[in-house]
């Protein structure tokens, strides 16, 4: 029998936002692109300061008012409401913003349209500069990021990591105070490296002085900057308030099904991490009884206002929440009625349910079903009132960049995702014939018997966290004269926040697969628990919801024996750590002033999950988990993958062509497993693996 080595085709995983393919191809930025890149780097620096640009913008920018240039925008009629709203009630930095409030959503919709409808790059620059000077900064960053993701002339433009643009959402107040301290003292005793004042601040998680509860022991996971930034970007890729544009129709990506699957997978990954600490099932959120886990983030706003904290055993059942709770009860009943009246058992039905629960623009009846997603966020936010009228101070749970820090996030979404499982209980159970791949057999799986995780130093550039002086003249600092304005008296500085972040040693697997003929197939890899927190083996009938997808790719099988090899560093939807703001600026300057090539690729794509979060921590003495491997017939998607966009520089959101195949998200675990022996087919294989963890500390004080 012949033997072949199959080179796995890089493909988009089913978990699409975890779902950009890892293309090794790259492009080189031309001069026009570098100009756009430079503008975005300039505009996102020190966002709360309006007068610190080292290369001043001309009078046409300073005097620009978009409502006086309506001819420069497509669909000007769609901007009229925003212009009227802004001129009567501007939303500035003396107001606290959250996209969750209907009133604030009006500004989001108008501002994103304004950026997106700009006819050319010059108009885009002018309106972005206008917004940078006048609009509430969190609103501005949110809107300009969305516009940059969807404008055709911005494809491939690399924005700095959100945790470096807005560090107040990610780093504790002590780290930010130390950053201010070094700056205020003129970087006294700080050595310059390559003519840059270089400060490294040891940054801790919120449990540095002791954990409030068992969940708080996992602050390294809850507060991971890359993981939280991923969730922020996912919700910017698929904003609930829009259907998308003509070329980016979000529902083509099965956005509702994706919404449910992403949160299911986040829950599965959280459960794996909890098991590493001998914690059990994630409790579902109960509005009527006190919540066991409190949380204190140690975060503060740019203006110094500390974020609310919650004590253990806190009750959300009080007068400020009664109305929200009543709405949850009403909409939940309507959703359950819809589920039980449903007579279709296809993927589109799941998509409809996800849209209903999120209450997004593609909901079949948003007025009737509301938004359970939003209502639960309002309940957790508790109606802390500020200002005038009915507005409440938006806490951590009202922002996508901070909501995952709080362990209650997982309790809430366990309740929300339970509606998905209620629906799937009405679907027919998969049988052996649904799982089998006739003529294909996984003969063996070759992978290490043990894997290793550890904590390692990670530096983020938080230079934006401190105020800088207005521009100075006569500086010879090359970065400063190029446009980077993190400086002290004309000399560049960088302030780095150093944290301990989870990581793992690379690993690889090889599948020996026999096929009776040449044919296309897909390979899927999951990791799941083997034992519960008490050491009891978990039957698959009670475990199927806990499997976390690691990889999904297409292969071509030849007749005979195939050896399918894959390294963890090549897994499709995992990305490398983000390049820091300073390093991005240095590369841009070198590419502008020399023959250095500014490469564009997807190795750090915003739509990918940090590679370092792939494996649960495990234990010092080893902890058994199980890998699940599947080889399955290839189902051609309705729209061929990568149609309509360039996967080298784009995540392809809204094109309907992100996915490697047409399988339901999460298959084969997407329906209840009532007979585990149905999984006893030749193209499935479970493999036990021990994960060892080096005994290192997560806080650095």
Swiss-Prot record:
Instruction: Tell me the leader sequence span.
Output: 1-21
Gene Ontology annotations for the cellular component aspect, listed alphabetically: extracellular space; larval serum protein complex
Q: What name does the UniProt record give this protein?
A: Larval serum protein 2
SUPFAM superfamilies in UniProt: Di-copper centre-containing domain, E set domains, Hemocyanin, N-terminal domain
Q: Which residues are glycosylated?
A: 204
Q: Does the keyword Signal apply?
A: yes
**Which domain of life does the UniProt lineage start with?**
Eukaryota
């Amino acid at each position: 029998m012949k033997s072949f080595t199959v080179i796995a085709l890089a493909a988009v995983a089913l978990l699409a936002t975890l779902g950009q393919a890892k293309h090794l191809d790259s492009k080189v930025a031309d001069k026009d692109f570098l100009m756009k890149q430079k503008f975005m780097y300039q505009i996102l620096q020190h966002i709360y300061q309006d007068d610190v640009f080292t290369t001043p913008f001309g009078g046409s920018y300073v005097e620009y008012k978009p409502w006086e240039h309506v001819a420069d925008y497509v669909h000007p009629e769609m901007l009229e409401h925003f212009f009227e709203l802004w001129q009567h009630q501007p939303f500035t930095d003396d107001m606290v913003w959250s996209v969750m409030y209907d009133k604030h959503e009006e500004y989001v919709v108008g501002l994103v349209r304004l950026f997106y409808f700009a006819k050319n790059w010059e108009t885009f620059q002018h309106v972005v500069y206008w917004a940078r000077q006048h609009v509430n900064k969190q609103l501005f960053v949110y809107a300009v990021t969305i516009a940059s993701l969807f404008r055709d002339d911005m494809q491939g433009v690399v924005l700095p990591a959100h945790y470096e643009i807005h560090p107040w959402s990610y780093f504790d107040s002590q780290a930010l105070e130390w950053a201010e301290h070094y700056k205020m003292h003129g970087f006294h005793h700080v050595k310059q490296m390559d003519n840059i004042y270089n400060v490294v601040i040891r940054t801790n998680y919120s449990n540095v002085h002791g954990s409030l509860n068992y969940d708080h022991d996992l602050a390294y996971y809850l507060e991971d900057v890359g993981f939280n930034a991923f969730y922020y970007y996912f919700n910017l890729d698929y904003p609930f308030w829009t259907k998308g544009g003509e070329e980016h129709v979000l529902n083509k990506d099965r956005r509702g099904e994706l919404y449910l699957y992403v949160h299911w997978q986040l829950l599965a990954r959280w459960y794996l991490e909890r098991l590493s600490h001998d914690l059990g099932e994630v409790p579902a959120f109960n509005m009527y009884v006190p919540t066991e886990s409190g949380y204190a983030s140690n975060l503060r706003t740019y203006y110094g206002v500390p974020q609310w904290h919650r004590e253990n055993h806190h009750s959300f059942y009080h007068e400020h929440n009664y109305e929200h709770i009543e709405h949850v009860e009403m909409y939940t009943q309507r959703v359950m009625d819809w589920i039980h009246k449903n007579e279709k058992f296809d993927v589109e039905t799941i998509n409809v349910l996800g849209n209903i629960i999120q209450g997004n623009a593609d909901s079949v009846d948003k007025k009737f079903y509301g938004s359970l997603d939003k209502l639960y966020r309002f309940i957790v936010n508790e109606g802390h009132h500020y200002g005038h009228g009915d507005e409440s101070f938006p806490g951590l749970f009202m922002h996508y960049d901070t909501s995952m820090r709080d362990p209650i996030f997982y309790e809430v979404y366990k309740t929300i995702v339970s509606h998905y499982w209620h629906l799937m209980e009405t679907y027919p159970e998969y049988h052996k014939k649904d799982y089998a791949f006739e003529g294909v057999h996984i003969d063996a799986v070759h992978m290490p018997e043990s894997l290793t995780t550890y904590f390692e130093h990670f530096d983020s550039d938080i230079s934006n966290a401190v105020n800088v002086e207005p521009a100075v003249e006569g500086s010879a600092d090359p970065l400063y004269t190029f446009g980077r304005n993190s400086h002290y008296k004309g000399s560049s500085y960088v302030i780095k926040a150093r944290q301990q972040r989870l990581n793992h040693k690379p690993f690889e697997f090889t599948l020996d697969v026999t096929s009776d003929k040449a044919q296309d197939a897909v390979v899927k890899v999951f990791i799941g628990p083997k034992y519960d927190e008490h050491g009891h083996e978990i039957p698959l009938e009670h475990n199927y919801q806990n499997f976390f997808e690691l990889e999904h790719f297409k292969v071509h099988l030849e007749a005979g024996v195939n050896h399918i090899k894959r390294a963890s560093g090549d897994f499709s939807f995992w990305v490398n750590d983000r390049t820091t703001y300073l390093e991005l600026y240095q590369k841009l300057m070198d590419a502008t002033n020399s023959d250095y090539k500014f490469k564009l690729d997807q190795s750090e794509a915003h739509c990918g999950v940090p590679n370092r979060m792939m494996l649960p921590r495990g234990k010092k003495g080893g902890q058994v988990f199980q890998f699940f491997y599947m080889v399955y017939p290839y189902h051609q998607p309705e729209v061929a993958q990568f149609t309509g966009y360039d996967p080298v520089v784009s995540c392809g959101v809204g094109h309907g062509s992100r996915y490697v195949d047409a399988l339901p998200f999460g298959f084969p675990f997407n329906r209840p497993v009532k007979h585990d022996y149905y999984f006893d087919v030749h193209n499935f294989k479970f493999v036990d693996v021990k994960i060892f963890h080096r005994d290192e500390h997560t806080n650095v004080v």
